[in-house]
A protein has these predicted regions:
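Feature activates predominantly on carbohydrate-active enzymes
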Residues: 1-183, 199, 230
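Gly/Pro-rich turn-and-neighbor structural signature
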Residues: 165, 169-251
């Protein structure tokens, strides 16, 4: 049997420059070995950005050396909701976090496969993992508990507290020491303002900044804009670009 293959050239390239895949390890921890398997599959499918969602209400998963309680306390929860209708829990403790060296290992493993790791630290909402560890960062001062179920929770970083703002800056500086990605994701979504509306520290900051309610934006939403802008300066000063969820624009 004889056969012939026509002479030709195949030019194959992806349609989109950004081809991303997100893994949420905040709600459920995955070991490094499993993440490497995911990265191998991403490379096989020409995905070039691995969006690593590292922090959540239900758990803080990345080592921050300046704030060791984040992983000593904030990475653990006693159980997890497994059926919303019956409110059934698995009664199994869940924990786990990545050391900075493990995170760097993932960064290199991905880079060797032409994938950039984009870290996400979601703030100022979705911060119960931080508030449990450092209650002074919240409006009420706690005590707080790690949620064992899903949803949006009223306790967030205190938007008027300079210490909470410095915490966010410190965390992101360590994140940028680990991750060379040009993009740093800071969340910005699902940040209820019920605590800020009654918090004397937040209201004092609102008055200091001269923020007023407008037909489109409450003064508390504008306080979030201030908070995110200050955080963004730290990112931009290090030559990076800030990413966030669409709700960031509500301020």
């Amino acid at each position: 049997v004889s056969a012939a293959i026509p002479v030709g050239t195949v030019n194959d390239y992806p349609r989109f420059g950004y081809r991303g895949f997100m893994v949420d390890v905040g709600r459920h921890y995955f070991p490094v070995s499993y993440l490497k398997q995911i990265i191998d599959m991403l490379a096989l499918h020409n995905i070039n950005y691995f969006h690593w969602h590292l922090t959540e209400d239900q758990g803080w998963r990345i080592e921050i050396k300046k704030y060791p309680k984040l992983t000593e306390i904030g990475s653990m929860r006693p159980r997890t909701l497994i059926d919303r209708e019956t409110q059934t829990y698995d009664e199994t403790p869940h924990s786990g976090f990545y050391t900075q060296e493990e995170a760097k290992e993932i960064v290199k493993y991905a880079a060797d496969r032409f994938i950039t790791v984009i870290p996400e630290v979601d703030l100022p909402g979705h911060m119960m993992g931080a508030l449990v560890s450092y209650p002074e960062l919240g409006c009420t001062g706690g005590p707080y508990e790690i949620p064992c179920k899903w949803g949006v929770f009223p306790d967030v970083l205190c938007g008027g507290n300079d210490r909470a703002l410095q915490f966010a800056k410190d965390v992101l500086n360590e994140i940028m020491d680990i991750f060379p990605s040009p993009y740093i994701h800071i969340g910005g979504d699902e940040c209820p303002k019920v605590r800020w509306e009654k918090c004397p520290v937040c209201q004092a900051k609102i008055r200091e900044l001269g923020l007023k309610d407008t037909p489109k934006h409450s003064k508390e939403n504008q306080l979030q804009t201030y908070f995110m802008s200050e955080v963004g300066k730290v990112i931009n000063d290090r030559g990076r670009k800030m990413l966030g969820w669409d709700e960031m624009l509500e301020g």
